[in-house]
Amino acid sequence: MSEIKEARLQKASSLVSKGFASYAQSFRVSHTTSFLIQKFDYLENGQEENFSVSLAGRVMAKRVMGKIAFFTISDQDGQIQLYLEKRIINLNLEKQKLLSFEDIKEIVDIGDWIGVYGTIKKTNKGELSIKVEKWEMLSKSLQPLPDKWHGLTDIEKRYRQRYLDLIVNPHSKNVFKTRAKCISFIRKWLDNRNFLEIETPILQSEAGGAEARPFITHHNTLDIPLYLRIATELHLKRMVVGGFEKVYELGRIFRNEGISTRHNPEFTSVEIYEAYSDYVDMMNLTEELIKDILADACGSLTINYQNKEIDFSKPWLRISMKDIVKKYTGIDFHSFNGDFLAAKKAVKNINVDFSNKVNTIGRLLNEVFEQKVESKLIEPTFVIDYPVEISPLARPHFDNKEIVQRFELFIVGRELANAFSELIDPVDQRERMQLQQSLRDKGDLEAHCIDEDFLNALEIGMPPTGGLGIGIDRLIMLITNSASIRDVIPFPLLKPEISSKKSEKLPLNEVK
């Protein structure tokens, strides 16, 4: 045990020996720091206000100068100074069982949670303060906080011990406040437009709705494998079949894939479906929604992200994948007319690497786009008309069955949204799922399985529908100017630190 921890344990014991709790049951707070700072901004230096308050927070700074002490405490909204005089604190010790000025000098450490009662004053130096009359220990901290001058510089420690990051880094706290407000805003925005939020299963017997590798678990009682959902799409479409014309779900998605500054295996998305709409309607909805979120969260449609200024007020570019690939690479995929070898030769000339799985012109086009174009799309750009091979759930164009009515929105070089006119033809959908299943049987773990119940739902009849998915984490990265997705997820997935005791790994059918 460290000397600091031992000393703090002794202080906690000292409180108990004096008849006080070192870990209180409760404390009634009358106001927050932000309320008090705003309400009493008018006070002149040295002026006092006989306004009684009770306030609680974590001690972030402590200065004792003889018979006077200054503390800074932090609550969820901000920080405020405490002003303590020995004469005032000790005034009622004989009448009431209270902690003394000497107690607060000796027992309270930076990191402790305390509650105080007092009135308002502004010091001669202009610092709004609580003039403390009595105080209580709410929770004794046994470990010191990171040094306030150097902060928490170990980035991985910030992610592993987010509680420390939130204590010493106000920016991190603001990021998660902004995240919560944006999520609330999205729900209200959709609710006000008569969309209904639906809760779909997280545990599913078939993992569908996206090309992604799922997490697999096992249900002991039913003795069946289950999958954590990789999308909410197929169940939300079932709701549309059932007669709900405007539905959405904002929730967690799980994909057993890589980790990077843009990817976390557990992430948040909102999927939106509207009957009688198509992908053009979804483009309009996407642009309107994101502009409204930015205006609410940032107060402007011009933001700075990682030293790049982005103006969202300008019209957002809408361009086909073939045309934007031609713009940035010079390769005209319109000209190949089904000649895969010619396309393959042209692509190799610009140093695009691809696997044997890339065996059609459509997949080759997508590979060129991802490797040579995507990172260059800084301003909001709707890339439309995707190859049918990579879009098994999207409606084909009437005049060209090789491309589908799909778009993805790219901002600062990364995908932020994905949408399409939904495929509602059950015969076409079955053929595509059968093709996906054959790819899966050959080892492509990201290909779709055949979902017979979903196909049955389509055979019952689904109206024309537009569908949209927006990545919430990437949106929050943009709004908060965060470089990594780990900065906007409170508890991102990390590899466990090496422990001296190895954990026992249970077989799947024994996990409960």
From Swiss-Prot:
Offer an example of a GO molecular function term for this protein.
magnesium ion binding
What keywords would UniProt list here?
Answer: Aminoacyl-tRNA synthetase, ATP-binding, Cytoplasm, Ligase, Magnesium, Metal-binding, Nucleotide-binding, Protein biosynthesis
Q: Where does this protein hold Mg(2+) 2?
A: E415
The record's subcellular locations are:
Cytoplasm
Reaction catalyzed: tRNA(Lys) + L-lysine + ATP = L-lysyl-tRNA(Lys) + AMP + diphosphate
**Magnesium: is it a keyword of this entry?**
yes
Q: Specify where it is mainly localized.
A: cytoplasm
User: Bound how, and how many: what does the cofactor note say?
Assistant: Binds 3 Mg(2+) ions per subunit.
InterPro entries xref list = Aa-tRNA-synt_II (IPR004364), aa-tRNA-synth_II (IPR006195), aa-tRNA-synth_II/BPL/LPL (IPR045864), Lys-tRNA-ligase_II (IPR002313), Lys-tRNA-ligase_II_bac/euk (IPR034762), Lys-tRNA-ligase_II_N (IPR044136), Lys-tRNA-synth_II_C (IPR018149), NA-bd_OB-fold (IPR012340)
Q: Which GO terms describe its biological process?
A: lysyl-tRNA aminoacylation
E.C. number: 6.1.1.6
- A GO term from the CC aspect: cytosol
Protein family per UniProt: Belongs to the class-II aminoacyl-tRNA synthetase family.
Quaternary structure, per UniProt, is: Homodimer.
Q: What is this protein called?
A: Lysine--tRNA ligase
